[in-house]
Design a protein with these regions (language model features):
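Juxtamembrane helix-loop-helix junctions in multi-pass membrane proteins
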Residues: 1-32, 80-83, 152-179, 228-230, ...
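Specific transmembrane alpha-helical segments of multi-pass solute transporters/efflux pumps
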Residues: 2-9, 39-88, 123-124, 208-226
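Transmembrane alpha-helical segments that form core, pore/gating elements
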Residues: 8, 34, 95-97, 101, ...
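Transmembrane alpha-helices of multi-pass small-molecule transport proteins
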Residues: 16-67, 94, 98, 151-155, ...
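Juxtamembrane helix-entry segments on the extracytoplasmic side of multipass membrane proteins
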Residues: 16-24, 49-55, 127-150, 189-206, ...
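Helix-helix packing/entry segments at the starts of transmembrane helices
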Residues: 25, 65, 69, 83-90, ...
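C-terminal-most transmembrane helix of multi-pass membrane proteins
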Residues: 27, 127-128, 201, 236-294
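Loop-to-transmembrane alpha-helix entry segments
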Residues: 48, 88, 104-124, 139, ...
């Protein structure tokens, strides 16, 4: 739910600060809080625990999460929060393709069906936007940013899972957040934060900072206790939450949150995309449970 609400709120925070500054402060706040918590409990990562493999995985995770954060944030200047989260469903498919191409995993029939549904759903979702996409204007730029951010996030997802054999989830996040904050420091303008005068925008800004800590902390813990497929089932529902939060936001504060520009075909397309992602990551489990019940 925190990931589902994030683009809705971040789009407002980006009216006060630019994307690199927002991404930098999110990483900085999260790393400082985690440093204090792990320091108090004596669970800070030790230098002796590092190896060439873990350092490589850390760099991979830093690249994945840093690029994802900034590309999606920049994309929100051009497209709606719901669009970013529908495109987020490219992540599980990219993860599957990495597994097939790199780790020689099988490409199951459920994954093939899921891929077909994803492509069909995306065509339906963008049914009234093809003119804007093919004109390669600002809307197309936003779509390409969000799509690229979703696919490169897989670098973080793979790194997080492999690093969990050596560190706990909070240690991994601390190292990735801390290093990522330095990546964005040269591009950030901290003075923008001091000039946020609107209390509503301040609230959105603070929420974005806390969201990083809560959302990725929960994701990391979930990977420690669940199979990756179970975690993926939950993440496929993110666009649904985003659509709900966008609708609620517009009804409560129409001056801040814009009305949805989606038609009925787009809504159906979004659901088809979610269904495709769900089948791809857990088709056999979901259908097996369904067949047992009937």
């Amino acid at each position: 739910m925190t990931w589902g609400s994030l683009p809705v709120i971040a789009q407002q925070a980006l009216k006060a600060v630019d994307a690199p500054t927002l991404v930098w402060i999110r990483f900085l706040v999260a790393s400082l809080v985690l440093f204090v918590l792990l320091g108090l409990t004596g669970k800070l990562p030790r230098p002796s625990e590092f190896s060439k493999q873990t350092l490589f995985l850390l760099v991979l995770g830093i690249i994945g999460i840093s690029a994802n954060f900034v590309l999606v944030a920049m994309g929100l200047h051009y497209i709606s929060p719901t669009t970013t989260q529908v495109l987020w469903q490219l992540s599980p498919f990219t993860m599957i393709l990495v597994g097939v191409g790199v780790f020689k995993e099988a490409f199951t029939h459920w994954q093939k069906i899921g891929l077909m549904l994803l492509l069909t759903g995306l065509v339906m979702f963008f049914n009234d936007k093809f003119g804007e996409l093919f004109s390669l204007g600002s809307y197309a730029v936003g779509v390409m940013m969000a799509a690229s951010g979703s696919m490169i996030w897989v670098c973080y997802g793979v790194a997080q899972k492999l690093l969990s054999k050596h560190f706990n989830s909070q240690q991994i996040l601390l190292m990735i957040y801390f290093c990522s904050s330095f990546v964005f420091l040269p591009f950030a303008e901290p003075s923008q934060i001091a000039h946020i005068g609107n209390p509503f925008l301040w609230g959105c800004f603070i929420y974005c900072c806390l969201n990083t800590l809560i959302g990725y902390g929960s994701f990391g813990e979930a990977l420690n206790h669940w199979d990756a497929s179970k975690v993926s089932i939950v993440t496929t529902l993110i666009p649904v939450f985003t659509m709900i939060f966008s609708t609620i936001g517009h009804h409560l504060a129409p001056d801040y949150f814009a009305a949805s520009d989606m038609n009925i075909v787009s809504y159906v397309g979004a659901m088809v995309v979610v269904a495709g992602a769900l089948l791809a990551v857990a088709g056999e489990k979901v259908m097996g449970l369904f067949l047992r019940k009937i």
